[in-house]
Amino acid sequence: MREILHVQGGQCGNQIGAKFWEVVCTEHGIDPTGTYRGDSETQLERVNVYYNEASCGRYVPRAVLMDLEPGTMDSVRSGHYGQIFRPDNFVFGQSGAGNNWAKGXYTEGAELIDSVLAVVRKEAENCDCLQGFQVCHSLGGGTGSGMGTLLISKIREEYPDRMMMTFSVFASPKVSDTVVEPYNATLSVHQLVENADECMVLDNEALYDIXLRTLKLVTPTFGDLNHLISATMSGVTCCLRFPGQLNSDLRKLAVNLIPFPRLHFFMVGFAPLTSRGSQQYXSLTVPELTQQMWDAKNMMCAADPRHGRYLTASAMFRGKMSTKEVDEQMINVQNKNSSYFVEWIPNNVKSSVCDIPPVGLKMAVTFIGNSTSIQEMFRRVSDQFTAMFRRKAFLHWYTGEGMDEMEFTEAESNMNDLVSEYQQYQDATAEREGEYEEDYDEA
């Protein structure tokens, strides 16, 4: 069966990852000891996408957990589902990366990376037909960003033909842990552009806004934010894990969403948004779901799709609904808002339908869009990066670990190129497309 190998790195990655496994376990009816307690055949039909079955009938997540300090792992291990993970798959150092990308990618992380790769290799060898990898990490810290991108490039070397999907939490403008976030994020994007196939872009600020505005939470905690992320992560892969009428896998997703190889940063959304405590919407209709899904306030990264155009988009509906109605709604959205879609990619919105809804809901939808407006986010990080880099502020932390200023300059220009590529396709029209191809050949 088409297995996915999940890797989580750094504090943020481990916390999101732990939450994700809680959601997936609940959906498949697996309790915290790894025992199946579900009530329907479909839960076990493709359980091996994410789980290995142990000899005693326990289901063990195909997950590798890594960090450069033991703290977060200890809290994952002592958490509700902590005992379900394979103990050998916890790989951690003691020193920490101190929010320093260079420590994660070149010094501390480089020392630990071989033990992580050994675990990855072992899990990959146990797979029947490995479909790809999914990596959870943040780009603002040291481990998730530095060691995370190091691992991605190493996996890329060893498994060049497997899909590499990342859930990357970007540094957000208002919610910031560290002053060097723009450095870490820019250095990471430089890697992700080259080595990842698809990146789901998340951002704390947008998640905070959703929690405040839509879910009416007074003080959203990271737990609430991770809850939103895990709902989306589970939605992205539901087609792989449950039977459906229109199925998609990581590769089909990529083929439908990525018109140009470098432009693989997606904004994601989820509907219906309900706060953890209350599922006040007893039932929603497909039109209501569709409307909420396309709403700019629902996007989990701080970029406004109304400021750009969609190159492509994909919607994954879950629950019992008519495919015909789904198709009608999607066409309806495109016709009414045609200016927000590039006209030189016809039929650029795909939908898939999976029969099994998330726990506690009748129907739900996960949205993935490849919109040119995501350049806003890169542009913002780039501005912050430039402001500090001009003055060479904090650079000694990086050069002290053996980095060269040249790497910063390269990463900066790669990110700026990415921004201008998005802008170029935002402005492109069907008639002028020929000119761009010539430009590309020269470049």
Swiss-Prot record:
CDD domains hit by this protein: beta_tubulin
Cofactor field: Mg(2+)
Pfam families attached to this UniProt entry: Tubulin, Tubulin_C
Lineage: superkingdom: Eukaryota
Bias (Acidic residues): 434-443
First-listed, main subcellular location of the protein, grouped into a coarse class: cytoplasm
A molecular function (GO) term: metal ion binding
Binding residue positions for Mg(2+): 69
Listed SMART domains: Tubulin, Tubulin_C
UniProt-annotated location(s): Cytoplasm, Cytoskeleton
InterPro entries, per database record: Beta-tubulin_BS (IPR013838), Beta_tubulin (IPR002453), Tub_FtsZ_C (IPR008280), Tubulin (IPR000217), Tubulin/FtsZ-like_C (IPR037103), Tubulin/FtsZ_2-layer-sand-dom (IPR018316), Tubulin/FtsZ_GTPase_sf (IPR036525), Tubulin_C (IPR023123)
Binding site for GTP: 11, 69, 138, 142-144, 204, 226
GO biological process: microtubule-based process
Gene Ontology CC: one annotated term: cytoplasm
Annotated function: Tubulin is the major constituent of microtubules, a cylinder consisting of laterally associated linear protofilaments composed of alpha- and beta-tubulin heterodimers. Microtubules grow by the addition of GTP-tubulin dimers to the microtubule end, where a stabilizing cap forms. Below the cap, tubulin dimers are in GDP-bound state, owing to GTPase activity of alpha-tubulin.
Subunit structure: Dimer of alpha and beta chains. A typical microtubule is a hollow water-filled tube with an outer diameter of 25 nm and an inner diameter of 15 nM. Alpha-beta heterodimers associate head-to-tail to form protofilaments running lengthwise along the microtubule wall with the beta-tubulin subunit facing the microtubule plus end conferring a structural polarity. Microtubules usually have 13 protofilaments but different protofilament numbers can be found in some organisms and specialized cells.
Stated family: Belongs to the tubulin family.
Name by which UniProt lists this protein: Tubulin beta-1 chain
Organism: Anemia phyllitidis
Gene: TUBB1
